[in-house]
């Protein structure tokens, strides 16, 4: 990358991800409007930035292009404010933690269903309501409902496991694991999808297993 484009960046998709995913998702999950409105906002700000900087088009270099888009995305996020960003990040993390793993199953995805990202709604509650309302397949919704219940039980076991570990194990060990878990949640932010939970699945399973083992010892 440095030899061809004089860039030390590893990838040239940061700007696209920022304007195409992070900004719209933050806009939506902070309760400011729908995902589609967030996408429109990002496009309009890109056009106005080009006019402001007196540019006819984006830089030819993919890395300069990405950097330009990313900077616009950062400007928009700063305008949203810390509380809106925090709300969007917490909401996105909660969705990724509680979303049923079966949602990413090829068999389930092959069933007729609406796109979660394309479903309109200002905020997660309205979006989920519209998603359920627009889903015509009973079997699809039934499987998702069962999967969600299992996910909720699993996360409850995880929380119990964390609490038990804090009481018994070294605080440094538990803190290190929680920091690692938190890192992946922060990096993912408001971008939702079951696949983004994969890096932390081993940690979640460890906490849940610890809770079950403690329950077995007591009984």
Q: Where do the model's predicted regions map?
A:
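Membrane-interface junctions at the ends of membrane-embedded or membrane-associated helices
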Residues: 163-173, 208-219
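Juxtamembrane membrane-interface segments at transmembrane alpha-helix termini
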Residues: 26-27, 188-194, 210-217
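Hydrophobic/aromatic-rich transmembrane helices and adjacent perimembrane loops
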Residues: 149-150, 194-212
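Membrane-interface anchor segments at the N-terminal boundary of transmembrane helices
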Residues: 80-83, 87-180
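Transmembrane-helix signature of polytopic, lipid-linked glycan biosynthesis machinery
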Residues: 1-3, 164-165, 180-194
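Short helix-capping/hinge motifs at transmembrane helix termini and TM-loop junctions
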Residues: 4-5, 98-102, 167-168, 191-192, ...
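Membrane-proximal stem/loop segments at transmembrane-domain junctions that anchor or position
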Residues: 9-120
């Amino acid at each position: 990358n440095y030899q061809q484009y004089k860039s030390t960046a590893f990838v040239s998709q940061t700007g696209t991800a920022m304007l195409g995913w992070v900004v719209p998702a933050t806009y939506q999950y902070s309760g400011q409007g729908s995902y589609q409105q967030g996408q429109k906002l990002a496009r309009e700000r890109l056009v106005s930035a080009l006019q402001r900087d007196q540019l006819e088009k984006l830089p030819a270099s993919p890395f300069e292009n990405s950097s330009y888009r990313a900077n616009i995305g950062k400007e928009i996020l700063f305008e949203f404010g810390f509380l809106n960003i925090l709300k969007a990040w917490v909401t996105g993390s909660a969705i990724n933690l509680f979303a049923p793993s079966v949602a990413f199953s090829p068999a389930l995805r092959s069933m007729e269903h609406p796109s979660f990202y394309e479903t309109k709604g200002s905020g997660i509650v309205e979006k989920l309501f519209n998603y359920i309302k627009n889903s015509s397949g009973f079997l699809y919704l039934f499987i998702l409902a069962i999967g969600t219940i299992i996910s909720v039980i699993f996360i409850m076991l995880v929380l119990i496991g964390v609490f038990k570990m804090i009481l018994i194990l070294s605080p440094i060990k538990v803190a290190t694991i929680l920091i690692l878990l938190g890192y992946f949640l922060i990096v993912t932010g408001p971008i939702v999808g079951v696949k983004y939970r994969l890096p932390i699945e081993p940690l979640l399973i460890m906490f849940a297993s610890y809770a079950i083992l403690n329950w077995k010892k007591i009984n």
